[in-house]
Amino acid sequence: TDRLVKSIVNSLNENQEKSKDWLIEKSKQYFTFFKNPSVVVAAGWYGHLASKMKEYTKGEVVSFDKDPMCKKVGHKLYRGKDIIFTDADIKYYDVKRFDIVICTSCEHLGQYLIDEFLKRRKKGSLVILQLNNYFSINEHINCHNNVVEFEKSLKLEKILYRGTLKLDKFEQWM
């Protein structure tokens, strides 16, 4: 359908690409904390970031999204990349077995859901989160005004990196 095609194209747009590349550029130094880390990308859409992460590990890479179509499309787009796609809700997904836990869609999730999701990770895992201030998108229910506000909302023990990526109409934080 047209809606699906637009969604796939949007998942690969310039801002998405810049955001994913920025995540890897600023985070890859921490991947070495683990030998062949296992990685989970929550709300991973069609798996573009999971595909990029696969270049940095021989460990398991999982991309999950609550939309079952993301799994179907992801399998087709990234066939042969050894990525596990699953349709699951972040509300229930168990992330305990993963060394690296990523969510680049925090603006789509309520704060309570993010907090509960992070409580389920294993101690010592690397958490990489992104959120933006693109308030004008209806689905963006959890935007913040700046990176400090975002950071405070997370209640994390230790912050290894914080930064801002300026994009066309908004800023992205990590």
PLM segments and residue spans:
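A short SAM/SAH-binding and catalytic strip from SAM-dependent methyltransferases
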Residues: F98-L113
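C-terminal substrate-binding/active-site "lid" region of AdoMet-derived donor-dependent transferases
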Residues: Q111-M174
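Conserved SAM-binding loop of SAM-dependent methyltransferases across substrates and taxa
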Residues: Y46-T57
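Conserved class I S-adenosyl-L-methionine
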Residues: F34-Y46
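S-adenosyl-L-methionine
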Residues: T1-F34, K66-I100
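Conserved SAM-binding motif I beta-strand of class I
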Residues: G59-D65
